[in-house]
């Protein structure tokens, strides 16, 4: 069992002395009460003297524990949690005891450090670091006290991710796009840096995890002729042929995120072959011989969860009796556990909001996870063995922000043009935020992806707009996750078709319900949401008074030519081959219809964006100059696909607010 080192970097909870920041984690006042949702209403309500003006820096600049790039990791002895936090203004690796009495900062630099993973002996931490938001993550290791930092990979043109320690702690498995094409599976020796390539970089491999004896890796990959399907594969860690587990038995769908049971006899995974994402088990008994070689048999598949709600992210209890997993119910996500023998299923953590990255301690009862609500950013929480309720380890929200002055979004559904119900979150501003306008203006906040989902978690953009007196509709249009496979695939081959209809139907619903005034609605979104913002302004110009797009796609043809290889495959999977579907690529691009954009448009872009290059935005800027459309354009240096620096996030939202104030409130 690992012991705390004699020396540590500075104790972050003690040393953090910036003015008016949140109290240390051990003194958080009644967090369970503060995050309870308020009464649902589709009209502005008053909170009286509790309302106060919030500075944009306190809201948009609020730190949060990273939930995009690897999340958290619980140490093998269950005593400490490693995580990436931007409390200093940049994502750095931190460690905190599960008792919550200390927080230690381990890295300190200008580059983003994410994806921390403990070595099996608890003495080392591996993590990823990129430069300027370029997502070309390199693998680093350091001692558990933050010392002896060492870079293991140096292929600066490639990105590395999904790192996993071997059981003996001598190697790390990962995927990289070192060939410049798709992501393939590799192993690096921690001591020497020697690399072993396990796959051919033709299939976009992901999520490698070691068998308990270190002889095999399980990973997910798309190796069907139809790249819309995914399955689990085994490959010898010494190199060799990959074996498909055939968890789908020839049906359409995806099986991903495989996790070995502690005894190595089963693999828990997420699959949507029955329409909803659920947790299943692949029983490997009889599949491998005594020497560990394949016998040519398929595993026995058992469905472990059986729910109308999507279930994902399985994690084994160390005693092997069951798994914890995440279950999404509309806009909320809870942690649950299910036992292998009985299939008995019960909640573990069900705070209002969204839970992610659940990890089980060696006692099989302690559970660490990330949690965020509409009124609090992503923080590390722990439910200790025999504890009734979980407790926070970190506290990210500034003490200057009263959670009660933030809006609790309402989960609504509205009909689209074809009759399909579209789920959405509605942020209704408090009466005190209005400007004597009667019916307030509205902003439709379109998420990226489109594989993604608006959840009842920390959304400082929607909160800020609501605080400024805007109604915000955050729709989960067709193509979103969280509502089953059919809904998720409903816009495949039709981006800018019926999904655009879902966006426009949301505006009609706001107007018909008297929630927002006509011709006082703006569109806002990033990435795919940025594409949809620009495309909506071009194809439905009568609906919109203004738009703001950040890191948005303007031409699917040129994006296919300039983006990363794995994203090119994603485009082909969702839109078709760029030659065979050339007309679709052309017609569904905002650039094609740029002359039809009449509403004022603000375009924001990261200079280092590896997904949607700056050249995308500049094509539309040139077209708008020719058509004399009112627009503005700003590029952020040292930023990628989204804005990681606090000053840039603040500037982005300040520009967007001024844009909407000027054009929706004129």
Give names to the regions the model predicted.
Residues 396-519, 526-527, 554, 559-569:
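Cap/lid segment of the alpha/beta-hydrolase catalytic domain
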Residues 475-666:
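Active-site-proximal cap/loop segments of hydrolase catalytic domains
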Residues 86-91, 132-137, 177-183, 224-230, ...:
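Short, solvent-exposed loop/turn segments at conserved positions within beta-propeller repeat blades
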Residues 81, 122-126, 169-172, 214-218, ...:
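Hydrophobic beta-strand positions that form the internal "hydrophobic ladder"
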Residues 3-23, 27-28, 35-68, 95-112, ...:
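Multi-bladed beta-propeller domains
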Residues 76-77, 120-121, 167-168, 212-213, ...:
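Residue-level detector of Asp-centered blade-edge/turn motifs that repeat once per structural unit
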Residues 57-92:
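Beta-strand-rich domains and repeat architectures in extracellular enzymes and scaffolds
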């Amino acid at each position: 069992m690992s012991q705390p080192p004699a020396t540590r970097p500075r104790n972050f909870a003690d040393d953090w002395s910036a003015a008016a920041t949140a109290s240390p984690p051990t003194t958080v006042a009644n967090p369970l009460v503060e995050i309870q949702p308020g009464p649902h209403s589709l009209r502005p309500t008053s909170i009286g003297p509790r309302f106060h003006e919030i500075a944009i820096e306190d809201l948009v600049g609020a730190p949060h524990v990273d939930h995009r790039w690897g999340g958290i990791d619980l140490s093998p002895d269950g005593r400490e949690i490693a995580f990436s936090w931007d409390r200093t203004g940049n994502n750095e690796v931190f460690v905190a005891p599960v008792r919550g009495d200390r927080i230690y900062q381990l890295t300190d630099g200008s580059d983003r450090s994410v994806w921390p993973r403990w070595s099996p002996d608890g003495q080392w931490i591996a993590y990823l670091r990129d430069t300027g938001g370029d997502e070309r993550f390199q693998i680093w290791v350091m001692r558990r006290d933050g010392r002896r930092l060492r870079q293991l990979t140096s292929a600066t043109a490639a990105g590395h991710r999904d790192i996993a320690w071997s059981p003996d702690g001598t190697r790390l498995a990962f995927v990289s796009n070192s060939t410049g094409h798709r992501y393939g599976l590799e192993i690096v020796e921690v001591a020497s840096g020697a690399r072993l390539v396990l796959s051919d970089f033709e299939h976009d491999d992901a999520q490698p995890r070691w068998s308990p004896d270190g002889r095999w890796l399980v990973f997910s990959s798309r190796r069907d002729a139809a790249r819309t399907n995914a399955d689990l594969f085994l490959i010898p860690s010494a190199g060799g042929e990959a074996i498909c587990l055939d968890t789908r038995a020839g049906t359409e769908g995806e099986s991903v995120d495989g996790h070995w049971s502690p005894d190595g006899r089963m693999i828990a995974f997420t699959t949507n072959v029955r329409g909803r994402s659920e947790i299943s088990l692949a029983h490997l008994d009889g599949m491998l011989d005594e020497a560990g070689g394949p016998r040519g048999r398929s595993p026995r598949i058992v469905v472990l969860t059986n729910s109308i709600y999507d279930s994902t992210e399985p994690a084994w209890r160390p005693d092997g009796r069951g798994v914890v997993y995440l279950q999404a119910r509309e806009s909320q996500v809870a942690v649950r556990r299910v036992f292998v023998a009985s299939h008995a299923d019960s909640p573990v953590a069900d705070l209002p909001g969204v839970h992610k990255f659940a990890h089980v301690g060696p006692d099989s009862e302690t559970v660490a996870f990330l949690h965020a609500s509409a009124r609090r950013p992503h923080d590390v929480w722990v439910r200790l063995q025999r504890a009734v309720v979980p407790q926070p380890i970190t506290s990210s929200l500034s003490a200057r922000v009263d959670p009660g002055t933030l809006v609790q979004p309402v989960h609504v559904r509205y009909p689209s043009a074809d009759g399909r119900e579209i789920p959405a979150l509605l942020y209704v501003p408090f009466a005190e935020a209005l400007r004597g306008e009667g019916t307030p203006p509205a902003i439709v906040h379109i998420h990226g992806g489109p594989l993604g989902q608006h959840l009842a978690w920390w959304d400082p953009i929607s909160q800020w707009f609501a605080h400024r007196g805007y109604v915000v509709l955050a729709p989960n249009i067709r193509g979103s996750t969280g509502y089953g496979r059919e809904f998720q695939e409903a816009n495949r081959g039709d981006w800018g078709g019926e999904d655009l209809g879902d966006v426009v139907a949301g505006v009609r619903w706001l107007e018909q319900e008297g929630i927002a005034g006509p011709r006082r609605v703006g569109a806002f979104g990033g990435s795919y949401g940025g594409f949809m913002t620009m495309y909506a302004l071009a194809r439905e110009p009568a609906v919109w008074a203004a738009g703001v797009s950040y890191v948005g796609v303007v031409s699917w043809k040129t994006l296919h030519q300039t983006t990363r290889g794995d994203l090119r495959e994603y485009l082909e999977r969702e839109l078709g081959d760029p030659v065979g579907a050339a007309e679709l690529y052309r017609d569904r691009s905002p650039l094609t219809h740029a002359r039809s954009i009449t509403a004022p448009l603000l375009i924001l872009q990261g200079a280092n964006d590896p997904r949607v290059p700056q050249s995308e935005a500049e094509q539309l800027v040139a077209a708008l100059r020719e058509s004399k459309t009112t627009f503005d354009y700003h590029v952020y240096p040292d930023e990628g696909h989204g804005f990681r620096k606090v000053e840039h996030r603040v500037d982005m939202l300040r520009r967007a607010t001024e844009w909407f104030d000027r054009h929706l409130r004129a």
